[in-house]
């Protein structure tokens, strides 16, 4: 199962209804994942070479670690990055690597703290993360921080692609969709205008007022 599409914060501001959230560094690479299903290990390389991706892992040891978790079905989603991926060699180094950012056990998505716990038990690296206020100025500041992953890779201070925002516990909206958003720097904007990196304060104010009205009737 491929990883879900994440909407930009300017378009979906539901996460801002929470006072705090987790921010995770967004890595600029190719979406990939490792799956454990009833004793079988499977690798999904995304846009990188399947052979090169599988070579990143010690298969026998990884099977032991997945088995030790005690769950028949586990998927670790992440990013294959570095090397020739997305022209980011200067930021992440010249070697292909994998970093995790999400864990699905059965049909349950884990919150960030539990994702970190599982990936540590599997010996897999997890993206940089922090619990912060959902104040827009705070989120903009975190989005614009230098890439932690670049520093981990020994590449010095480089701009991060942006951040992914997730609630402290997993929640879904009224449509049944997970509450999650991405907030990217202008250098990595998906629209030429860069407007997808800017959140309209007026739209956010309407969202807050709507939530306050709803709370009056609960």
For each predicted feature, which ranges?
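Core nucleotide-handling region used for phosphoryl-transfer chemistry
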Residues: 1-218
């Amino acid at each position: 199962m491929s990883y879900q599409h994440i909407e930009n914060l300017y378009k979906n501001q539901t996460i801002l209804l929470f006072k705090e959230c987790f921010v995770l560094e967004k890595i600029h690479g190719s979406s990939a994942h490792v799956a454990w299903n009833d004793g079988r290990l499977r690798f999904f390389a995304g846009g990188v070479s399947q052979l090169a991706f599988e070579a990143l892992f010690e298969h026998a040891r990884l099977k032991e670690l997945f088995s030790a978790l005690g769950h028949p079905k586990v998927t670790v989603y992440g990013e294959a990055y570095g090397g020739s991926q997305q022209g980011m060699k200067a930021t992440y180094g010249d070697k292909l690597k994998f970093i995790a950012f999400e864990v699905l056990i059965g049909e349950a998505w884990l919150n960030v703290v539990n994702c970190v716990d599982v990936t540590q038990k599997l010996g897999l690296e997890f993206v940089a993360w922090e619990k912060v206020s959902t104040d827009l100025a705070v989120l903009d500041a975190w989005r614009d921080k230098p890439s932690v992953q670049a520093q981990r890779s020994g590449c010095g201070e480089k701009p991060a692609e942006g951040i992914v925002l997730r609630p402290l516990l997993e929640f879904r909206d009224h449509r049944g969709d997970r509450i999650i958003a991405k907030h990217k720097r202008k250098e990595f904007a998906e629209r030429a205008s860069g407007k997808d990196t800017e959140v309209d304060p007026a739209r956010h104010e309407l969202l807050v007022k709507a939530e306050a009205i709803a709370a009056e009737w609960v």
